[in-house]
Amino acid sequence: MSKLIKGIAASDGVAIAKAYLLVEPDLTFDKNEKVTDVEGEVAKFNSAIEASKVELTKIRNNAEVQLGADKAAIFDAHLLVLDDPELIQPIQDKIKNENANAATALTDVTTQFVTIFESMDNEYMKERAADIRDVSKRVLSHILGVELPNPSMIDESVVIVGNDLTPSDTAQLNKEFVQGFATNIGGRTSHSAIMSRSLEIPAIVGTKSITQEVKQGDMIIVDGLNGDVIVNPTEDELIAYQDKRECYFADKKELQKLRDADTVTVDGVHAELAANIGTPNDLPGVIENGAQGIGLYRTEFLYMGRDQMPTEEEQFEAYKEVLEAMDGKRVVVRTLDIGGDKELSYLNLPEEMNPFLGYRAIRLCLAQQDIFRPQLRALLRASVYGKLNIMFPMVATINEFREAKAILLEEKENLKNEGHDISDDIELGIMVEIPATAALADVFAKEVDFFSIGTNDLIQYTLAADRMSERVSYLYQPYNPSILRLVKQVIEASHKEGKWTGMCGEMAGDETAIPLLLGLGLDEFSMSATSILKARRQINGLSKNEMTELANRAVDCATQEEVIELVNNYVK
């Protein structure tokens, strides 16, 4: 008899295969064992650190190729932990001063750090705790000579079942053999869920108990479309889901026909579908999925995974490569957005209790112009190789935009005096991520050339709900009428001044949000490249006039639930 387990649909698709349980390795050791060869034990610890660095670097590089630079950035954070003297030195001191064995010293010190970070009322610091825990486990495995589970070694078709998949687990999945995965914990915004969508592997998270209900080798079905796991399906269920899987693949093949099609509603209104990228390595997916431009080029990934700033020349080459590859299509480049959840070891940024509201993005760039100016110079030099737009992140006041623009114009003049050619057709815009910016959109619209709404931050700042916190995840509401009203206000302000508005947050590719955004008049939808064809088909089947009526009704709703019900009734 089959068993149904419900979870959260994290990545589309249907997987049918035997279960492969990720078994936790035995990392037990004698905590009380003292060592006599202190120097040898320190060397053993240092060797484990170096082995972990080599391992993580390989995983990071593999993740960048398979998933893109933005998804690989989590491993930059892990590598930073391994280089942090505030963590490493106390471990070495404990071995030397207390004759502790390396495993005990490692776990005692990292446990202290994890406890401190987890006790902070700050989700960013709690994420740091998770990084330290993951890295500590890897180092401990090298100290003890125990191999961690390595999904890359799987050589038969399986569905992976585990309590959770770490980023390194997910990055090592071989798509040829891993058909899907299901976990006890996690949500749609967890690292494993995000990576599974990039890999296009069906995934279900948050089942709570799947590791207790599935045995090694059980036949299971993962329905990533509905969030269902069927354990040991009946013959009829197997046939039904095989048909469902075939329909899913046929549908994906059908979508490919839209690669070179226009994005236009049934009543003739055009929309632009663009892609979000982190590095030039992401370009093949952009082109394969028929993106009409790049709506967000996250330049911070040029700065990560290294021990010094990228030079102006290195940046110029990267920007030039992207602009040339897009062959005249618009490329919107976001200037450096460091701080908050992204750190650089060589900048020595101060620790802040609430880094998401602190010294980051345009605030950092205006204060440290030795970082900002080389980037602007590289962008200006690259501008002659395509259609370049530049936008500044985390702008809260009109004075910040004016100061950033003044610096850019100053560097433009400097470059011309040096004999460089610079395009005269560069548009300057801002990210709208802060409610104050949305409230003053009419003021900004008189001076900027365009807006790009960053809904990921706008939602969490408006509703005061950290999107990475499970405790307040119910408040992270993309369809809340307050968010829709802010989006409407920004779009209307831009159109009144003859400007355009794009969106580059997760919401831009969301099938429930797309009808609303179309109705609100959004000009550009920028999303993960893998979402573009599905969004194109959806928009091509909608009426702009009807969606305008829908959006006008949605902004008058009182709750997110009312908005979702309204959309479901309109779009069937």
UniProtKB/Swiss-Prot annotation:
GO terms for cellular component: cytoplasm. Its cofactor is Mg(2+). Phosphoenolpyruvate binds at residues 298, 334, 456-457, 467. The active site is at residues 191, 504. Its EC number is 2.7.3.9. It catalyses: L-histidyl-[protein] + phosphoenolpyruvate = N(pros)-phospho-L-histidyl-[protein] + pyruvate. Keywords: Cytoplasm, Kinase, Magnesium, Metal-binding, Phosphotransferase system, Sugar transport, Transferase, Transport. GO terms for molecular function: kinase activity; metal ion binding; phosphoenolpyruvate-protein phosphotransferase activity. GO terms for biological process: phosphoenolpyruvate-dependent sugar phosphotransferase system. Mg(2+) binds at residues 433, 457. It comes from the Bacteria. Gene3D superfamilies: Phosphoenolpyruvate-binding domains, Phosphohistidine domain, PtsI, HPr-binding domain. The keyword Oxidoreductase does not apply. It is found in: Cytoplasm. Belongs to the PEP-utilizing enzyme family. The reaction takes place in three steps, mediated by a phosphocarrier histidine residue located on the surface of the central domain. The two first partial reactions are catalyzed at an active site located on the N-terminal domain, and the third partial reaction is catalyzed at an active site located on the C-terminal domain. For catalytic turnover, the central domain swivels from the concave surface of the N-terminal domain to that of the C-terminal domain. Homodimer. General (non sugar-specific) component of the phosphoenolpyruvate-dependent sugar phosphotransferase system (sugar PTS). This major carbohydrate active-transport system catalyzes the phosphorylation of incoming sugar substrates concomitantly with their translocation across the cell membrane. Enzyme I transfers the phosphoryl group from phosphoenolpyruvate (PEP) to the phosphoryl carrier protein (HPr). The N-terminal domain contains the HPr binding site, the central domain the pyrophosphate/phosphate carrier histidine, and the C-terminal domain the pyruvate binding site. This is Phosphoenolpyruvate-protein phosphotransferase.
